[in-house]
């Protein structure tokens, strides 16, 4: 127990910026309405962190759930237009509830609605970062949500666990707190007959850890433990910490930053990625794949080398110079790296397997020695 406390203290005592992701199940009542009392409690805790000197961003789910409650809809809509319309109604109620609660403590709620494009476009990415940091100076608390009304992918495929990881990396925040309806990551599937125990600390999100994820989807929530582990993996690989905890635990946020044994703490990797490498490795959707042989994989993953044409065995997808691509093992097609390519897919198809000295002979020109330079690559 003492060792666990020491580890928590060692990691969490360095935190200055905190991203708090609040799930739908934490924010809404059983009938789907915004739980204003719960928002008031959480808003008070966020303000406490602000007064303790932390910069805090709230990533809030609940727009669709709030809209369903406002409209008296029991069943989650199935069509995209209905989902987007319900989200438009619910988002205004949600941000209004936050603003009302923050104003009781002298703070403003600043609504920040984002789409995938805001992260993938480098200029918009940096503008978003600058805006949020400016809000920190204005006595405002950013409340971030996916723009459900116009964002197709979020409603169909994703949720705010992924968004919270992107925001954490965007801001280089040292801690992501994911508040859910569960106490943390359990060591087994909890049932009436089998008692499950929360794992206090996870050093590495291994295959075995991923197998512990179980689907806790509700009628109004989208993400289960699997998506939370995926978010935790993105953040810890960038060198920051993650805590998954129960959002209805009294004083949960203060307990976490004060290093109490609450929830599951996922330890960060020792090396912190630069902002640019976070953007390359975990923000942009890759446009294609490059498959490499064992020698190239070892040189990239173990020795930190650049990717040369000689180690490439195959190309998948159509992409241009400057696009982000995935780098995969030849045998099992596992993605182990991402990077910014110096050559297009058509060019790589021609020079794959060639030595660097032969590139000019094959193409008639040579743009770079490397297909992907190590400075533009992230090992996942």
Predicted segments, located by residue:
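C-terminal catalytic "cap/lid" subdomain
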Residues: 2-75, 80-108, 112-380
């Amino acid at each position: 127990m003492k060792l666990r406390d020491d580890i928590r203290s060692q990691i969490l005592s360095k935190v200055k910026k905190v991203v708090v992701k609040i799930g739908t199940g934490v924010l809404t009542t059983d009938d789907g309405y915004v739980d204003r009392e719960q928002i008031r409690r959480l808003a008070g805790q966020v303000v406490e962190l602000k007064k303790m000197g932390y910069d805090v961003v709230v990533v809030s789910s609940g727009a669709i759930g709030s809209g369903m409650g406002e409209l008296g809809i029991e069943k989650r809509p199935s069509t995209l237009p209905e989902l987007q319309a319900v989200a438009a109604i619910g988002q205004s109620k949600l941000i209004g509830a936050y603003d009302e609660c923050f104003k009781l403590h002298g703070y403003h709620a600043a609504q920040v609605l984002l789409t995938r494009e805001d992260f993938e476009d480098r200029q918009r990415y940096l503008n978003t970062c600058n805006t949020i940091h400016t809000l920190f100076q204005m006595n405002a608390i950013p409340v971030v949500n996916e723009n459900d009304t116009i964002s197709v992918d979020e409603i169909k495929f994703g949720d705010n666990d992924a968004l919270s990881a992107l925001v954490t990396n965007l801001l280089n925040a040292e801690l992501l707190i994911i508040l859910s309806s569960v106490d943390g990551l359990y060591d087994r599937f909890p049932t009436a007959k089998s008692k499950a125990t929360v794992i206090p600390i996870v050093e590495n999100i291994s295959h075995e850890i991923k197998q512990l994820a179980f689907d806790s989807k509700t009628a109004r929530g989208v993400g289960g433990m699997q998506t939370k582990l995926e978010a935790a993996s993105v953040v810890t690989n960038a060198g920051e910490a993650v805590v998954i905890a129960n959002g209805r635990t009294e004083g949960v946020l203060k307990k976490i930053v004060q290093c109490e044994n609450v929830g599951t703490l996922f330890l960060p990797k020792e090396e912190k990625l630069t902002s640019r490498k976070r953007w390359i490795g975990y923000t942009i959707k890759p446009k294609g794949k490059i498959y490499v042989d064992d020698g190239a994989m070892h040189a990239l993953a173990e020795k930190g080398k650049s990717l040369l044409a000689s180690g490439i065995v195959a190309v998948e997808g159509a992409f241009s110079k400057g696009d982000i691509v995935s780098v995969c093992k030849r045998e099992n097609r596992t993605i182990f790296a991402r990077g910014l390519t110096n050559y297009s897919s058509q060019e790589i198809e021609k020079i794959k397997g060639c030595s660097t000295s032969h590139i000019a002979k094959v193409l008639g020109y040579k743009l770079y020695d490397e297909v992907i330079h190590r400075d533009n690559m992230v090992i996942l």
